[in-house]
Each structure stands twice: as C-alpha cells, then as structure tokens.
Amino acid sequence: PAWLVDCPCVGDDINRLLTRGEK
C-alpha cells in the first residue's frame, strides 16, 4: 500500500508481512 511508503521503518516490516500473505 502507498500509505506504508510514508514510514519505511514500519512499512518495510508490514510490507514483508503483506507480501507473504498475498503470495
């Protein structure tokens, strides 16, 4: 999500979780 890019420190962590969930 774009709102995650706002906070890389947390976005990277959440992005990883979302990526695992989507795949």
From Swiss-Prot:
Q: How is it modified after translation?
A: Processed by the macrocyclase-peptidase enzyme POPB to yield a toxic cyclic heptapeptide. POPB first removes 10 residues from the N-terminus. Conformational trapping of the remaining peptide forces the enzyme to release this intermediate rather than proceed to macrocyclization. The enzyme rebinds the remaining peptide in a different conformation and catalyzes macrocyclization of the N-terminal 7 residues.
Positions of the propeptide segment: 1, 9-23
InterPro entries according to UniProt: Amanitin/phalloidin
Specify the cross-link site (Cyclopeptide (Ala-Pro)): 2-8
Could you tell me at which residue positions the 2'-cysteinyl-6'-hydroxytryptophan sulfoxide (Trp-Cys) crosslink is annotated in this chain? 3-7
- Please give one Gene Ontology molecular function term for this protein: toxin activity
- Tell me which domain of life the UniProt entry assigns to the organism this sequence originates from: Eukaryota
Question: Which keywords does this chain's UniProt record carry?
Answer: Thioether bond, Toxin
- Family assignment from sequence similarity: Belongs to the MSDIN fungal toxin family.
- State the name under which the record lists this protein: Phallacidin proprotein 1
Species: Amanita phalloides
